[in-house]
């Protein structure tokens, strides 16, 4: 009969015994052996055919050791076995004041793990501490064997969890797995109190406090705390492929994205891309007769001169277009402008630049009204003073999705219709919606004496006014045609157009201030439009018109129907809706 040797003196004294699959036992479950050590009373008497291994870790009863010493530098107790023992696994701590006990017979010892499996079991400590992957295990339907600590020993030497049936390669993995059933988290952070089931998770957590980032990218200065995060980052440096990493790469700065739409958004703020557009625009402007077809966006450096601060309406346009992902229908972005001197709304040779001309293209009150066409009264808008002919070459294009000023560039002016920003330049030949409204008095014997505009039933307008995508004026003093809106085929109203538009939609309010407006397509046919009488805005889409009318109050048209804010006029109302500063309650 073999008697186990006495435990070292530092292990003597009261303590609780716990197996990996059991709860803490009381002191009644302990009995002292003659040598003074603590032996659980549930252990069988040691015989020639049986032996046991005890692995334990005790903390000093004084309690002066810190958590860091407990989990990072605590001494590990030796493995104690009988002379017949042929296998001893490295000891691991369960928790403070706990003992892990393993029992197996000599018959089991004949089926111990081979050298390869013993090597894997020794590597369990690496798996437990690294803990970046799930514990090794699989479901096995093998029959039960005599009980091992907290599990069932299988014929292949592995352990099976007696709670869920998970098969573990060794006792250490099973021990960590059992904590998912018991809720035990023995590893604690002494700085924030967070607890973990594995030591590797605690070590990784400590890096958050120390700021350590050991994993560094070999291609750039990126660093991170986790290996899997570095693996995900390395995909950005991989070869562009639809199946690997982020295939959509910016050719100007090298950044990669997972989606084409994200790449398009990036190009709107990519400094290198905008700088290349600026250089390309200057090169094209220096070649007379060439058309600007590849210009997708004009940067702010081209929109405004260095000595002139950007106006509020232009800054508003830029801020609104950045929110295109949240809008039902996107704005017409900054696109190509082609303009010729023959299309200018004044006589170049006469030098009469005092004529005020206003061009409003695809205006909206808020991001939700992306398909609306604004018609703001010309008598209230700020006039655009066109300079004499000797200054035409010094003009720079001012392009905005909210307020567009008409200034010359080589070629002729074309504004695209409401379409997605990512479409190619092959669709640019279709002219966008334009509204031309002269400020000067119109001399026409058949015009109305109040505003000088012809009636909508007049059919004597020039055929040149119906040219697709272009609104032009004669060069001399002949009578001017009524204001005309030319709508491209991309407009939402073009698909819904009625060959006989309602007269009420094309006329202004009857009375002394009656106005006439013709909305035609690019081939000259009439297009249905919906006009807000309060804001004097034309909508080509009935849905957007309905949404807009819902913003007006029932009692006062300039009362916000969302928050109840009262505006003095339609400009203040439009500004309030655009800003979206609704204070409800």
UniProtKB/Swiss-Prot annotation:
One of its GO terms (molecular function) is zinc ion binding. A zinc finger (C2H2-type) spans 159-181, 187-209, 215-237, 248-271, 530-552, 558-582. Coiled coil: none annotated. A motif (CTBP-binding motif PEDLA) lies at residues 425-429. The modification Phosphoserine is found at residue 105. It is found in: Nucleus. Residues 475-484 have a biased composition (Pro residues). The modification N6-acetyllysine is found at residue 335. Its main location: nucleus. Residues 1-43, 68-98, 410-489 are annotated as: Disordered. Residues 25-34 have a biased composition (Basic and acidic residues). Keywords: Acetylation, DNA-binding, Isopeptide bond, Metal-binding, Nucleus, Phosphoprotein, Repeat, Repressor, Transcription, Transcription regulation, Ubl conjugation, Zinc, Zinc-finger. SUPFAM superfamilies: beta-beta-alpha zinc fingers. There is a cross-link at residues 100, 500 (Glycyl lysine isopeptide (Lys-Gly) (interchain with G-Cter in SUMO2)). One of its GO terms (cellular component) is nucleoplasm. Belongs to the Ikaros C2H2-type zinc-finger protein family. DNA-binding protein that binds to the 5'GGGAATRCC-3' Ikaros-binding sequence. Transcriptional repressor. Interacts with SPI1 and MITF to repress transcription of the CTSK and ACP5 promoters via recruitment of corepressors SIN3A and CTBP2. May be involved in the development of central and peripheral nervous systems. Essential for the inhibitory function of regulatory T-cells (Treg). Mediates FOXP3-mediated gene silencing in regulatory T-cells (Treg) via recruitment of corepressor CTBP1. Self-associates. Interacts with other family members; IKZF1, IKZF2, IKZF3 and IKZF5. Interacts with CTBP2. Interacts with SPI1, MITF, FOXP3 and CTBP1. The N-terminal zinc fingers are involved in sequence-specific DNA binding and heterotypic associations with other family members. 'Eos' means 'rising sun' in Greek. This is Zinc finger protein Eos. The gene is IKZF4.
């Amino acid at each position: 009969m073999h008697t186990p040797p006495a435990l070292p003196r530092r292990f003597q004294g009261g303590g609780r015994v716990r197996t990996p699959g059991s709860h803490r036992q009381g002191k009644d479950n302990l009995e002292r052996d003659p040598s003074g050590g603590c032996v659980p009373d549930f252990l069988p008497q040691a015989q020639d055919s049986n032996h046991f291994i005890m692995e334990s870790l005790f903390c000093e009863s004084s309690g002066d050791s810190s958590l860091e010493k407990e989990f990072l530098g605590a001494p590990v107790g030796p493995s104690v076995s009988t002379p017949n023992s042929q296998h001893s696994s490295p000891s691991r701590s369960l928790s403070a004041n706990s003992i892990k006990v393993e029992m197996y017979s000599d018959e089991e010892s004949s089926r111990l793990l081979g050298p390869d499996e013993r090597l894997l079991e020794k590597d369990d400590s690496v798996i437990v501490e690294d803990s970046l992957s799930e514990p090794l295990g699989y479901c096995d339907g093998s029959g039960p064997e005599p009980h091992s600590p907290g599990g069932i020993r299988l014929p292949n030497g592995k352990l099976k969890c007696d709670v869920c049936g998970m098969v573990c390669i060794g006792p250490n993995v099973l021990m960590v797995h059992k904590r998912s059933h018991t809720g035990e988290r023995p590893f604690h952070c002494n700085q924030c109190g967070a607890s973990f089931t594995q030591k590797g998770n605690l070590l990784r957590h400590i890096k958050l406090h120390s700021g350590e980032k050991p994993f560094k990218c070999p291609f750039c200065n990126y660093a991170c705390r986790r290996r899997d995060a570095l693996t995900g980052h390395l995909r950005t440096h991989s070869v562009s492929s639809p199946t690997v990493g982020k295939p959509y790469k910016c050719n100007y700065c090298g950044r990669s994205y997972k989606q084409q739409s994200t790449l398009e958004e990036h190009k709107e703020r990519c400094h290198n891309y905008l700088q290349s557009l600026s250089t390309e625009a200057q090169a094209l402007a220096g070649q007379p007769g060439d058309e600007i077809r590849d210009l997708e966006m004009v940067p702010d450096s081209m929109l405004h001169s260095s000595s002139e601060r950007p106006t509020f309406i232009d800054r508003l346009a830029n801020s609104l277009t950045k929110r295109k992902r949240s809008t039902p229908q996107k704005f017409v972005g900054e696109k190509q402008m082609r303009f010729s001197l023959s299309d200018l709304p004044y006589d170049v040779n006469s030098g009469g630049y005092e004529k005020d001309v206003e061009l409003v293209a695809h205006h909206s009150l808020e991001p939700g009204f992306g398909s609306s066409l604004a018609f703001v009264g010309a008598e209230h808008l700020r006039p655009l003073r066109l300079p004499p002919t000797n200054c035409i070459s010094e003009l720079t294009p001012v392009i905005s999705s909210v307020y567009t000023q008409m200034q010359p560039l080589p070629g002729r002016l074309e504004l695209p219709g409401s379409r997605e920003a990512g479409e190619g330049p092959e669709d640019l030949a279709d002219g966008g919606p334009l509204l031309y409204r002269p400020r000067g008095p119109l001399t026409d014997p058949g015009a109305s004496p109040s505003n000088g505009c012809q009636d909508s039933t007049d059919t004597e307008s020039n055929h040149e006014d119906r040219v697709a995508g272009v609104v032009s004026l004669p060069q001399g003093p002949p009578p001017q045609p009524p204001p005309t809106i030319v709508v491209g085929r991309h407009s939402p109203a073009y698909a819904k157009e009625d060959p006989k538009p309602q007269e009420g939609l094309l006329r202004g309010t009857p009375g002394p201030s009656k106005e006439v407006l013709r909305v035609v397509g690019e081939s000259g046919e009439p297009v249905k439009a919906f006009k807000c009488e309060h804001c004097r805005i034309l909508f080509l889409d009935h849905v957007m018109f309905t949404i807009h009318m819902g913003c007006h109050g029932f009692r006062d048209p300039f009362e916000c129907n969302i928050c109840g804010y009262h505006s003095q006029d339609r400009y203040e109302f439009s500004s309030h809706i655009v800003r979206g500063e609704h204070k409800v309650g």
